[in-house]
């Protein structure tokens, strides 16, 4: 389980978060610029908190008091950023295996499950938007992450594609049983995918009590 208690001061917003990430899909909503992306980038190791700590099970990833910092490449995190999500001139296979932290068997399994087997040697830039989203998810899952972080995974898609891709992503995430933070500003999307709903407003992450 990921546990965290940290503050990160950014020019645009100061993010404060204190809690733990349980299994299932946790949706994080909030307005643009509220600090959602900064929060998951701290978990991923792409942004350093100003104060506080982050732990994964018995391993400490961040402890600012002890000046401890585990870099992103040493954390078992699957991160799917917003925006350009594939390397368009690389094949689908090379996109998925880009981190080199998985195995050929894992790649084969992902290609099969994601419906991308026939595109193994196709340049990712030639695929549709929905297919590219599946490539990006495959890359995030390739290293068998302990946590999956998705930053606005449907925002680049037109409305006609969103429902099908959303259902595909949710199905695969649940099948792989990996804890997930799904960031979105779309409330209807949040209601469709999440086991629980966190909010971010002016940098404050609000985590409702469960049970």
Regions found by a protein language model. Name each.
Residues 61-79:
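ABC ATPase NBD coupling module
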Residues 62-64, 104-119, 170-171:
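Conserved ABC ATPase "signature" region
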Residues 123-127, 131-133:
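Conserved ABC ATPase signature
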Residues 137:
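Hydrophobic anchor residue at the start of the ABC signature
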Residues 142-146:
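A short, proline-enriched helix->beta-strand linker immediately N-terminal to the Walker B motif
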Residues 148-152:
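Catalytic Walker B motif of ABC-type/P-loop ATPase nucleotide-binding domains
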Residues 177-183:
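Conserved H-loop
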């Amino acid at each position: 389980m990921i546990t965290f208690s940290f503050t990160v001061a950014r020019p645009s917003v100061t993010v404060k978060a204190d809690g733990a990430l349980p299994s299932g899909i946790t949706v994080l909503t909030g307005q643009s610029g509220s600090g959602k992306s900064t929060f998951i980038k701290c978990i991923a190791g792409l942004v350093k908190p100003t104060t506080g700590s982050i732990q994964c099970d018995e391993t400490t990833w961040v402890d600012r008091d002890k000046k401890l910092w585990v870099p992103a490449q040493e954390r078992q995190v699957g991160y799917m950023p917003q925006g350009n999500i594939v390397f368009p001139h690389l094949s689908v296979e090379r996109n998925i295996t880009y981190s080199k932290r998985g195995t050929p068997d894992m790649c084969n399994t992902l290609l099969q499950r994601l419906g991308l087997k026939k595109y193994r040697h196709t340049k990712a830039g030639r695929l549709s938007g929905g297919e590219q989203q599946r490539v990006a998810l495959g890359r995030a899952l390739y290293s068998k992450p302990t946590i999956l972080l998705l930053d606005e995974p449907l925002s680049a898609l037109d409305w006609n594609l969103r429902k099908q891709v959303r259902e595909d992503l949710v199905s695969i995430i649940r099948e792989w049983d990996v804890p997930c933070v799904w960031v979105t500003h779309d409330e209807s999307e949040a209601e469709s995918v999440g086991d629980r709903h966190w909010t971010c407003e002016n940098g404050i992450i609000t985590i409702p009590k469960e049970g």
